Swiss-Prot record:
Coiled coil: none annotated. Gene3D superfamilies: 3.30.420.40. InterPro entries: ATPase_NBD (IPR043129), Gcp-like_dom (IPR000905), KAE1/TsaD (IPR017861), Peptidase_M22_CS (IPR017860), TsaD (IPR022450). Its main location: cytoplasm. Keywords: Acyltransferase, Cytoplasm, Iron, Metal-binding, Transferase, tRNA processing. This is tRNA N6-adenosine threonylcarbamoyltransferase. Its EC number is 2.3.1.234. Belongs to the KAE1 / TsaD family. The gene is tsaD. It is an enzyme of class 2 (transferase).
Length: 344
């Protein structure tokens, strides 16, 4: 049986997973660093890298035990090798390459974004091509996923990522870190129409997005309010989340038009939303409705596979393993690595 070991360390989650050739997840362990970074209100790169270094060996041992797997049973080792916080990326990549060398097993360098892009093929086994909205704390882009290693970026944020906007607004409201889930929780209790926020470049006619102006508008409102109580916080969270939904819905329509100009596959019309923001149930509902209007089905991974995890890295490794796309051990990890720059 083919077993793929996946390692993810691009930000603040130390993750290790083992999956089989049949897309079965035997074990998927994530060691969160939230408590280590919460006091700073965001991720501190050096702390993250040191934490990966101390957690990876433990995570690997736990995955092997949970999956009843020996190291010698592993067919190949896939590790995030960019983009991300370079310290953590180097730690995970070096750990994987050391295992590869010691075990004489192939190494596969995985683009973290490709891991997110292919998650729906792990969970739903959907065919190529499909339209992807990658929405996380570090990235926000529409991508035509045409095949393995074949990606066309249709548009992206010109400033902040949408997940970053969630986290920064949460910090303005003195909510806990990470901010995305806290905003969603508070938004359920608030009035989404209480405050009217701007929707930058919503009528640009292309797939690019902007969230910096929205974030600034929230900050300005907070500074001008005489009192900030729970009701106000809930209303701001709800209004902010509503505005994000409006922006993304509009841009999904632009992305569908752009996507249909470069693909002729109209019998399987799938839109995938991946990345941490994909876990937001409000946005799932809004974007599902938008997709349905255009005859598309919106697919999103289960919550535990929306945020950073190693199962998605292992699966990307499986697709590359099946195509004999291995990576030399002298591969250099990358802090920046566009999906369009992936080579097969």
């Amino acid at each position: 049986m083919i077993k793929i070991l996946g390692i993810e360390s691009s930000c603040d989650d130390t993750a290790v997973s083992i999956i089989t050739e049949n897309r079965e997840i035997l074990s998927n362990i994530i060691i969160s660093q939230n408590t280590e970074h919460a006091v700073f209100g965001g991720v501190v790169p050096e702390i993250a890298a040191r934490s990966h270094l101390s957690h990876l060996d433990k995570a690997l041992k736990n995955v092997l035990k949970e999956s009843n797997t020996k190291l010698t049973d592993i067919s190949t080792i896939a590790a995030t090798s960019g983009p991300g916080l370079i310290g953590g990326v180097i730690v995970g990549s070096m750990f994987a390459r050391s295992l590869s060398s010691a075990l004489k097993k192939p190494f596969i360098a995985i683009n973290h974004l490709e891991g997110h892009a292919l998650t729906a093929r792990l969970t739903d086994n959907i065919p190529y091509p499909y339209l992807l909205l990658l929405a996380s704390g570090g990235h926000c882009q529409f991508v035509a996923v045409l095949g393995l290693g074949k990606y066309k970026i249709l548009g992206s944020t010109i400033d902040d990522a949408v997940g970053e906007a969630f986290d920064k607004v949460a910090k303005m409201l003195n909510l806990a870190f990470p901010g995305g889930p806290e905003i969603e929780k508070r938004a359920k209790l608030g009035d989404p129409h209480k405050y009217k926020f701007p929707k930058p470049i919503i009528n640009s006619g292309n797939c690019n997005m902007s969230f910096s102006g929205l974030k600034t508008a929230v900050r300005t409102l907070i500074m001008n309010l005489k009192e900030i109580n729970d009701t106000v916080i809930n209303d701001i969270a709800a209004s902010f989340q509503f505005t994000i939904g409006e922006i993304l819905s509009s841009k999904v329509q632009d992305a569908i038009r752009a996507y249909e100009q470069i693909t002729n596959n109209f019998d399987k019309k799938n839109i995938v939303i991946a990345g941490g923001v994909a876990a937001n149930k409000y946005l799932q509902k809004i974007l599902s409705s938008c997709a349905k209007t255009y005859g598309y089905r919106l697919i999103y991974p289960p919550i535990h596979l929306c945020t950073d995890n190693a199962a998605m890295i292992a699966y990307a490794g499986l697709e590359r393993y099946n195509n004999k796309l291995f990576t030399p051990l002298n591969f250099s990890p990358k802090a920046r690595w566009s999906l369009e720059d992936i080579s097969n």
